[in-house]
């Protein structure tokens, strides 16, 4: 197992290099001009051209790529944001604190609300609980997040005045509406996946075996069915966590939260190259680590997968 | 679970109580800002979000106060010769850290800003010479009409000592001469300013942009337009210039709220691509075919002004008589006749390129519908800001559009609006943005830029109108909605809120 | 001493005659909920195809008098900010939205399932390399990928579908890989291999039916997002250009009016919800029909 | 049929499945009795309803779609269909346990095999964890698996070993009744014999009664005392092993023997039963077997036929016994 993890960590080096080269090349072929967003709309074409030259944007691809890779991987410097004038790493970490709060809260909601809902639906297959749960789930995945967010604001912030409409200056209260709005789809999808997976597992022979042993419904459900049912859900949760750490642009925009998503989207829109490239690299690293974690959790939950990681000596 | 919930609720309540409590002390105002200023350092460019906080954060040598130019840090301006001016500062300026501002700081600021290259106008400043503690001599390489003022207004001034003391070139914690000091900057969220009790200028000499009628100013960045409305309704913000036109009725004449309407200094106009529409009659026909009233109704909820030239009529060099001239008002007969003359028949297709934004999409759609009445198709090509900015000036892209919906404005002169797209010297390929290489047009605009006398202005305007290389459409109106905490809203000449100058 | 094949149960016999596909279809046809979903989808598709002839108004016809008109008998769903009939725009918009939504979902699923099966089946090096490439692709923000596709390959419907589907592939692969890993080592797979089943057959008839369920769930839920995403592509040279209606764009146009004129958002939102709902009903039915554990 | 030594008495048991709106009659009015220490064999084709009978006894039918609309299952004086679920849980695994058909899927793939045995021990014998582990290891050794393999997972076991684990699990609490659902089908012949020997052995040691579900007449001959031939959810013929083996009367039973390779005769080909089992959702009127029965006559198609005692407790559900006897005679 440790060998496997070590191998995966080593693999991260080419992955990071791959991400760096790919993002650099994409930014290179993407039209759009960082100079124009820096100088504002009243700059003329000649002034823009001068600024581009000064920023070194007119150098050939290879020169710029080399400079970028040298700076990133040899000097470990992600550069300074064109727009904010601050270090990309510091900027990203500052934004990450908000994103992390939202991601963790949302994941918690998703797991601790979605999973029980899915279990309830599966154990009452085709019953009322199932129908209600699945209806909510469908609502969850088909209601656009911004719509839900704005409705929540209208009710709880504008009409009732319980919570702030937007911003991050009210402590935890600032995060309640964003998290509810953001996790609704996650809860829904978690519930559906749990249900689907539970249904598969509940029909398995080993569940009948467990029942035939005289175990109580609860024990059968939680000791035998759930752990098996959760295996595919690990991917969902891992992927969801990875995505959420990349920021949730819609929610961050609506609630005026200066999270990673807005930082990155703004950077993409204004072609703030250092932020885009540095951000993608760091987020890619985080994502890869989470995916590695997912694979490790897999191995812990499912001995069959662990056996596959450890080589093919498996069966005796 | 219940326990946890009640705990959370209690926490929430405690937190919200705390925030209300702190808001009670002193007079404070919260301004809703749609754009993120990002770097608030002095020598950054003029990205859209920055303009909103510029005058609260910094002072310049000169500002435009109402319709007149006034010295802010500058006490006297003396002309030495055509390209040389002496600037005399007040001799009692101190910044928020107590540093004295002297002529050497002026030299430092202009040189640093020019070297940073984010304020491209400064390229016409050749050098700044320190004559004495409070007198700096500016040497310019060239000065067109209005350039002197815009140059002196362009560069925010800070002391060299404070700038060098900052770790990040004042990107987050500028120390300036302004009456308000940044005390907290949560990047992307809020910027809070406290009034500087030791502001240097005497009240009777304070320019509008430096007034300080309130103790604390918070700019809150709210990118979503609906949330801006919600925040104002919930009175989390006191004033915003970014309330969508269709929501104005929620605040106008409503108890506790008020709305001030201020014409925007930008104008929407059409640029015709000379490569694909070389015939003046065809361009004129399109201009006649478009009904600006429709555009105002569809894109601006009925509130907007017809443009009378390429640019609006708020500039000092705008010639009054143009207001009464005919300027391609919607005329079906003329449009048909001109289309016939140009040989344009039904089935013709134009490609209209524009910068995507709600109002632009609607203007473009209105134009599309208007030309549709003549059997002419219009293909809309929307681009996001970055792509539009690139394609607009890209010679290679000129084969991909026929009409461009663009907008432009300037902080001082109409000629500066014209310069943006009509001066071929400012393009990298020696033609206007519309690919016109017309020597007469060029000589007329150069004349107007060098000397914006009504004659020169009119000559250029009339020629442009006759050729219809570009066609001014409409200027919008900004809605300043505010709670009655603000009794009179004040804006700078760029249409941005000046929270310190508002009355409470 | 054992009894030779005494007889086959009827399902098994049918499978011989109809093949696996026919068998799945047969079970699907018997599932009422799935059939309702399918019927509504077909109705929507028919509306989309016939929309140029059956919309009550021209979708692009603007009218100053009808700006933001509320739903009424003249305009069942009301009118938008340009005075255009929302019902007509939704009907016509079904063309772009359904086409883009369905096509890109199908492309993403097919590619994802192919890759996922390969990765899950072969494991080892193949797994490592493909998954790491996916790590790299997934690190790039979708918007940037789309802009790059638009810039490098130009506009056009194919590239739009590519841009929309590329984001969905990694998730599908990961899901499938995850669930194949759990069935990969089961005896029936080994048995199938030992009797010299072709790899293709092992994958399609033994591995996939046992591991596809999470993919179906995730794909059918994702289509709503895909339709919404299509709206943002029109600003970067892909997607559908105005005034041709498209549900995602209608929704984002109406977004800023949501508290003032909610009908601008509600109806396109409902249209998207309907599609998501139907596909989910169909997807659930399909999953049940494909589930080998339900055969007997 | 009253006997004081009866451990289990099933009366009129009926099981239905509802599938896509159709009602499938899996088990129809099945009655039989089992004495202490004895073994009954339920014989029939796949899908005949044998497994459903066993699962109905343990009440582990998947409900829905399955349903038990009628009947009685009397076990040690209690009607299992009426006891509470909590009481049932105390019976399952302890008094009655089951060996499942498919060892490949009967074990929880992500739980250590020993743990799965220890679980049932701990549950019913209320012992400490340590004791339950010891017992589980002992059980593993009893079925011929080294105790140290307690900590391994099912995927590390071969099919035969998994089946032994399943058996160990079923026998862990010394049940009074063992339901063995085709315990050897998934195994190869040598292991089959070992497993059967083992079951027989354990049965003798623990004086356990057993219901042996199989389609393999060889196994029946080896372990069963009585035999019930099940066809389309009904008992068609019932009798002692000797009665069934030496004097099969029902045409289906005869057919079963006909499809056995008889090493003593030099018949070149087996004679399998023609046709297919009936669709349980749409059973034929009259005798369920008549479409395939070479002796079927008019009356077989008309009405349902009752189970009749044809002597010595040998029951048969046929109205043409005489014709069959004649036909048999002719053949010989």
Segments predicted by a language model, with ranges:
Chain B
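Periplasmic-binding protein-like
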Residues: 277-316, 362-363, 461-474
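Periplasmic binding protein-like
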Residues: 31, 372-424, 455-456
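A structural "hinge/loop" feature
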Residues: 34-52, 73, 99, 147-156, ...
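Structural transition elements
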Residues: 8, 304-341, 359-360
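N-terminal lobe/hinge region of extracytoplasmic solute-binding protein
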Residues: 32-80, 88, 111, 175
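Aromatic-rich, solvent-exposed beta-strand/loop patch
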Residues: 96, 139-156, 175-224, 248-266
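Surface-exposed binding/hinge segments that line
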Residues: 78, 82, 120-163, 168-169, ...
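Extracytoplasmic/peripheral linker and loop segments enriched in polar/acidic and small residues
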Residues: 379-388, 417-484
């Amino acid at each position: 197992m440790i060998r496997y993890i070590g191998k995966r960590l080593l693999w991260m080096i080419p992955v990071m290099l791959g991400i760096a080269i790919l993002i650099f090349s994409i930014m290179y072929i993407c039209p759009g001009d960082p100079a124009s967003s820096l100088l504002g709309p009243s700059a003329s074409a000649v002034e823009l051209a001068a600024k581009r030259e000064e920023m070194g944007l007119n150098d050939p691809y290879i020169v710029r790529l080399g400079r970028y890779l040298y700076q990133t991987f040899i000097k470990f410097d992600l550069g300074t944001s064109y727009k904010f004038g601050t270090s990309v790493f510091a900027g990203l970490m500052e934004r990450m604190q908000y994103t992390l709060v939202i991601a963790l809260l949302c994941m918690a909601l998703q797991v601790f609300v979605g999973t029980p809902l899915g279990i309830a639906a599966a154990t009452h297959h085709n019953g009322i609980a199932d129908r209600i749960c699945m209806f909510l789930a469908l609502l969850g995945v088909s209601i656009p997040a911004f719509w839900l967010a704005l409705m929540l604001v209208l009710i709880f912030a504008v009409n009732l005045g319980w919570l702030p409409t937007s911003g991050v200056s009210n402590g935890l209260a600032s995060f309640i509406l964003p998290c509810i709005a953001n996790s609704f789809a996650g809860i829904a999808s978690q519930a559906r996946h749990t249900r689907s997976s539970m249904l598969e597992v509940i029909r398995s022979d080993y569940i009948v075996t467990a029942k035939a042993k005289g175990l109580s419904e609860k024990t059968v459900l939680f000791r035998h069915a759930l752990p098996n049912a959760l295996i595919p859900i690990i991917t969902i949760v891992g992927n969801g966590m990875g995505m959420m750490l990349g920021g949730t642009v819609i929610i961050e925009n609506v609630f005026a939260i200066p999270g990673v998503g807005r930082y990155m989207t703004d950077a993409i829109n204004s072609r703030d190259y250092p932020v885009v490239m540095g951000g993608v690299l760091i987020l890619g690293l985080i994502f890869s680590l989470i995916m590695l974690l997912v694979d490790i959790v897999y191995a812990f939950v499912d001995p069959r997968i662990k056996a596959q990681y450890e080589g093919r000596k498996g069966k005796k | 679970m219940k326990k946890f919930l009640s705990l959370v609720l209690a926490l929430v309540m405690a937190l919200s109580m705390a925030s209300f409590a702190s808001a009670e002390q002193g007079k404070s105002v919260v301004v809703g800002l749609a754009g993120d200023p990002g770097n608030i350092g002095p020598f950054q460019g003029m990205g859209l979000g920055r303009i909103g906080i510029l005058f609260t954060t910094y002072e310049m040598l000169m500002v435009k106060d109402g319709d007149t130019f006034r010295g802010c840090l500058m006490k006297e301006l003396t002309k030495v010769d055509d390209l040389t001016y002496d600037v005399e500062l007040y001799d009692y300026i101190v910044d928020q850290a107590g540093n004295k501002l002297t002529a050497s700081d002026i030299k430092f600021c202009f040189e640093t800003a020019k070297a940073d290259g984010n304020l491209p106008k400064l390229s016409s400043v050749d050098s700044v010479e320190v004559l004495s503690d409070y007198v700096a001599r500016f040497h310019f390489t060239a000065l067109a009409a209005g350039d002197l003022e815009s140059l002196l207004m362009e560069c925010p001034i800070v002391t060299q000592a404070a700038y060098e003391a900052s770790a990040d070139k004042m990107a987050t914690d500028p120390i300036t001469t302004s009456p308000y000091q940044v005390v907290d900057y949560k990047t992307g969220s809020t910027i809070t300013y406290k009034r500087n009790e030791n502001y240097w200028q005497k009240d009777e000499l304070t320019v509008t942009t430096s007034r300080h009628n309130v103790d604390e100013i918070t700019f809150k960045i709210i990118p979503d337009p609906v949330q801006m409305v919600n925040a104002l309704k919930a009175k989390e913000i006191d004033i915003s210039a970014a309330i969508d036109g269709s929501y104005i009725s929620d605040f106008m004449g409503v108890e506790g709220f008020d709305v001030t309407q201020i014409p925007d200094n930008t104008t929407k106009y059409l640029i015709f691509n000379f490569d694909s529409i070389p015939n003046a009659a065809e361009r004129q026909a399109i201009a006649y075919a478009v009904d600006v009233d429709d555009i105002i109704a569809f894109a601006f909820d009925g509130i907007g002004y017809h443009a009378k030239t390429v640019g609006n009529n708020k500039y000092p060099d705008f010639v009054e008589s143009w207001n009464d001239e005919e300027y391609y008002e919607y005329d079906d007969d003329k449009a048909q006749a001109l289309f016939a003359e140009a040989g344009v028949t039904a089935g013709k297709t134009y490609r209209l390129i524009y910068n995507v934004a709600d109002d632009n999409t609607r203007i473009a759609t209105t134009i599309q519908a208007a030309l549709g009445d003549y059997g002419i198709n219009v293909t809309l090509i929307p681009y996001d800001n970055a792509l539009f900015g690139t394609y607009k000036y890209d010679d290679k892209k000129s084969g991909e559009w026929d009409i461009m919906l663009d907008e432009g404005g300037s902080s001082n002169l109409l000629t500066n609006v014209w310069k943006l797209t009509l001066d071929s010297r400012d393009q990298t390929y020696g033609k206007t943005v519309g690919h016109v290489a017309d020597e007469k047009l060029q000589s007329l605009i150069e004349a107007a830029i060098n000397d914006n006398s009504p004659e020169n202005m009119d000559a250029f305007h009339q020629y442009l109108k006759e050729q219809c290389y570009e066609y001014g459409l409409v200027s919008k109106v900004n809605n300043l909605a505010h709670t009655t905490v603000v009794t009179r809203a004040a804006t700078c000449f760029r249409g941005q809120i000046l929270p310190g100058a508002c009355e409470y | 001493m054992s009894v030779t094949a005494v007889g086959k149960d009827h399902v098994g016999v049918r499978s011989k005659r109809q093949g696996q596909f026919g068998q799945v279809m047969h079970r699907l046809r018997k599932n009422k909920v799935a059939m309702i979903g399918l019927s509504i989808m077909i109705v929507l598709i028919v509306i989309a195809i016939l929309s140029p002839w059956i919309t009550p108004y021209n979708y692009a016809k603007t009218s100053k008098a009808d700006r933001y008109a509320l739903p009424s008998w003249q305009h069942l769903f009301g009118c938008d900010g340009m005075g255009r009939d929302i019902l007509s725009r939704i009907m016509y918009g079904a063309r772009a939205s359904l086409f883009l939504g369905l096509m890109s979902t199908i492309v993403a699923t097919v590619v994802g399932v192919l890759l996922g099966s390969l990765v899950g089946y072969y494991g080892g090096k193949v797994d490592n390399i493909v998954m790491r490439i996916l790590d790299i692709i997934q690190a790039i923000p979708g918007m940037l990928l789309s802009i790059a596709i638009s810039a490098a390959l130009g506009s056009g419907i194919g590239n739009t579908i590519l841009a929309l589907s590329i984001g969905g592939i990694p998730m599908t692969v990961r899901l499938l890989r995850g669930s194949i890993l759990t069935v990969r080592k089961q005896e029936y797979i080994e048995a199938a291999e030992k009797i010299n089943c072709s790899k293709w057959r092992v994958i399609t008839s033994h591995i996939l039916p046992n591991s596809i369920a999470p993919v179906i769930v995730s794909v059918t839920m994702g289509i709503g997002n895909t339709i919404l995403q299509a709206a943002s592509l029109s600003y970067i040279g892909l997607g559908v250009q105005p005034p041709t209606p498209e549900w995602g764009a209608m929704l984002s146009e109406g977004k800023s009016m949501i508290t003032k004129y909610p009908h601008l958002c509600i109806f396109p939102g409902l249209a998207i919800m309907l599609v998501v709902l139907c596909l989910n009903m169909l997807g659930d039915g399909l999953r049940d029909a494909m589930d080998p554990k339900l055969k007997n | 049929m009253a006997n004081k030594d009866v451990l289990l008495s099933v009366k009129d048991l009926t099981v239905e499945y509802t599938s896509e709106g159709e009602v499938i009659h899996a088990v129809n009015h099945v009655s039989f009795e089992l004495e202490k220490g004895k073994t009954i064999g339920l014989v029939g084709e796949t899908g005949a309803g044998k497994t459903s009978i066993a699962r109905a006894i343990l009440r582990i039918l998947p409900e829905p779609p399955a349903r038990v609309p009628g009947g009685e299952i009397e076990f040690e004086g209690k009607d299992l269909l009426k006891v509470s679920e909590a009481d049932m849980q105390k019976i399952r695994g302890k008094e009655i346990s089951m060996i499942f058909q498919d060892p490949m899927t009967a074990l929880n793939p992500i739980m250590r095999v020993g743990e799965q045995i220890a679980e049932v021990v701990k549950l019913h014998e209320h012992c400490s964890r340590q004791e339950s582990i010891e017992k589980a290891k002992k059980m593993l050794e009893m079925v011929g698996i080294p105790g140290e393999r307690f900590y391994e997972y099912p995927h590390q076991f071969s099919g035969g070993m998994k089946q032994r684990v399943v058996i160990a699990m079923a026998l862990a609490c010394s049940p009074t009744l063992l339901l063995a659902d085709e315990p050897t089908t998934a195994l190869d012949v040598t292991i089959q014999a070992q497993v059967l020997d083992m079951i027989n052995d354990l049965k003798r040691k623990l004086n356990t009664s057993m219901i042996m579900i199989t389609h393999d007449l060889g196994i029946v001959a080896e372990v069963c005392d009585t035999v019930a031939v099940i066809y389309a959810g009904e008992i068609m013929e019932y009798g002692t092993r000797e009665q069934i083996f030496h004097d099969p009367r029902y045409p289906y039973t005869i057919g079963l023997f006909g499809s056995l390779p008889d090493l003593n005769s030099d018949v070149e080909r087996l004679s399998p039963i023609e046709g297919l089992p009936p669709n349980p959702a749409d059973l034929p009127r009259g005798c369920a077997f008549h479409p395939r029965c070479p002796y079927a006559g008019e009356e077989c198609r008309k009405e349902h036929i009752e189970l009749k005692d044809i002597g010595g407790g040998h029951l048969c559900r046929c109205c043409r016994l005489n014709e069959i006897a004649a036909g048999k005679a002719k053949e010989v």
